[in-house]
């Protein structure tokens, strides 16, 4: 999938699009750097000997979000000199607010700072009510719903007083800014192409941002695999990729990447059989030109040491 996206970017550049008008979104800094390197290698082999200037708008959703927020801060009532809290700093601030409310003592048995931050983060990224998030994901915290609501309100106020944003705010504030039609159009018009890697891992906020930037889908390319959506516990929403084509009129074109380069056909046969059970999915039949007569084995081991010993012995 990633190689497909890199070739797409290289093709766009080869067709004359300036790299500064390409927005490429990934889920890690390392993935963004790898994407840049792949694009450069592909263009270096081009018959015209093309080279690409630095893809200045390639990065994670959060990094790009921070950059846009600093640039458009005054348009949305934000101080551009805001500081960014990492997860540890955010948890410490949450704990400070817990302490002010008298909820940090062992006797209170109130959720830990890490759990509180996880609940808050889930409500923001999943765009779900607190009650729903607690009931479905953190049911052991149901008795504390009112206290959590007060805590989160105070946490937000503390961030505003200190002119700082946490990682979730980097998405939330951009999504809110892009809900202003003229601002979304202005930002969207800066990019002829927006490309997203691992789209099955996006959450509701990220999908909102993309659809606001390119509401008609022009120049929008996403790559992903609905069968690899395994980050629901981090608020990833598989419906983002399943519903992507129908957001547009006419519907987005779906290109199926059915060839697998890593596995042998017996492994893919097993994978195809499992994937076929899904009630809703994009139809694809994975295949490989790597033949093998050996079928996958189901092996039961006692622990990780036994597992490692078995694998090493093979």
Task: Please state what every model-predicted region is.
Residues 7, 37, 41, 63, ...:
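Generic recognition of well-ordered alpha-helical segments
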Residues 1, 23-24, 31-32, 57, ...:
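Conserved helicase NTPase motor core
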């Amino acid at each position: 999938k990633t190689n497909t996206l890199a070739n797409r970017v290289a093709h766009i550049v080869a067709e004359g699009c300036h790299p500064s008008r390409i927005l490429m979104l990934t889920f890690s800094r390392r993935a963004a750097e790898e994407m840049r390197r792949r694009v450069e290698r592909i263009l270096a082999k081009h018959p015209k000997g093309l080279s690409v200037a630095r893809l200045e708008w390639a990065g994670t959703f959060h990094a790009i979000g921070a950059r846009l927020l600093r640039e458009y801060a005054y348009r949305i009532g934000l101080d551009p000199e805001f500081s960014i809290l990492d997860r540890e700093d955010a948890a410490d601030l949450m704990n400070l607010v817990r302490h002010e409310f008298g909820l940090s003592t062992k006797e209170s048995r109130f959720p830990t700072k890490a759990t509180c931050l996880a609940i808050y983060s889930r409500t923001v990224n999943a765009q779900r009510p607190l009650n729903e998030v607690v009931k479905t994901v953190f049911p052991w915290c149901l008795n504390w719903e009112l206290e959590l609501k007060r805590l989160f309100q105070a946490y937000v106020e503390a961030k505003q007083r200190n002119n700082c944003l946490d990682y979730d705010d980097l998405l939330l504030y951009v999504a809110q800014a892009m809900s202003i039609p003229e601002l979304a159009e202005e930002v969207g018009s800066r990019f002829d192409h927006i490309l997203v890697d691992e789209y099955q891992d996006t959450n509701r906020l990220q999908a909102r941002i993309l659809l606001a930037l390119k509401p008609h889908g022009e120049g929008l390319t996403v790559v992903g695999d609905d069968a690899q959506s395994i980050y629901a516990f981090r608020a990833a929403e598989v419906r983002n990729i399943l519903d992507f084509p129908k957001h547009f009129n006419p519907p987005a074109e779906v290109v199926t990447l059915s060839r697998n380069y890593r596995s042998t056909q017996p492994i893919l046969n097993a994978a195809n059989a499992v994937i076929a059970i899904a009630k809703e999915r994009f139809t694809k039949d994975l295949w490989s030109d790597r033949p093998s007569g050996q079928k996958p084995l189901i092996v039961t081991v006692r622990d990780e040491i036994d597992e490692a010993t078995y694998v090493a012995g093979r």
